Amino acid sequence: MKPEIHPEYHEITVVMTDGSSFKTRTTWGKPGDTMRLDIDPKSHPAWTGVQKLVDTGGQIAKFNKRFSNFGLK
C-alpha cells in the first residue's frame, strides 16, 4: 500500500439509543469522539416491526418552511 494516502484509523465510542455504549475503530471523527445514534438495531423498524416517526433536527418543519409558498391548500 502507498504510504500517507489512507485516512487515520482510531477508536471512538458509539452510544446507542438505550444509553448502552461500545468502542469501535473507525475513520469517522477524531480519536476519542463519541457518536450518538438516533436509530440503531434496537429501535429500527426493520428489526423491531414497529413504525416510528423520527424528526431529527426539525427536518419536517424545515421542509414545510421551504415549500410553504407553493400554496396547495
UniProtKB/Swiss-Prot annotation:
Keywords attached to this entry: Ribonucleoprotein, Ribosomal protein, RNA-binding, rRNA-binding
PROSITE patterns noted in UniProt: RIBOSOMAL_L31 (PS01143)
GO biological process, one term: translation
Keyword Zinc-finger in record: no
One Gene Ontology cellular component: ribosome
Molecular function per GO: rRNA binding; structural constituent of ribosome
Recorded coiled-coil stretches: none
Superkingdom in the source lineage: Bacteria
InterPro entries hit by this protein: Ribosomal_bL28/bL31-like_sf (IPR034704), Ribosomal_bL31 (IPR002150), Ribosomal_bL31_A (IPR027491), Ribosomal_bL31_sf (IPR042105)
Subunit organization: Part of the 50S ribosomal subunit.
Function, as annotated: Binds the 23S rRNA.
Family designation: Belongs to the bacterial ribosomal protein bL31 family. Type A subfamily.
Protein name, entry field: Large ribosomal subunit protein bL31
Organism of this sequence: Rhodospirillum centenum (strain ATCC 51521 / SW)
Lineage: Bacteria, Pseudomonadati, Pseudomonadota, Alphaproteobacteria, Rhodospirillales
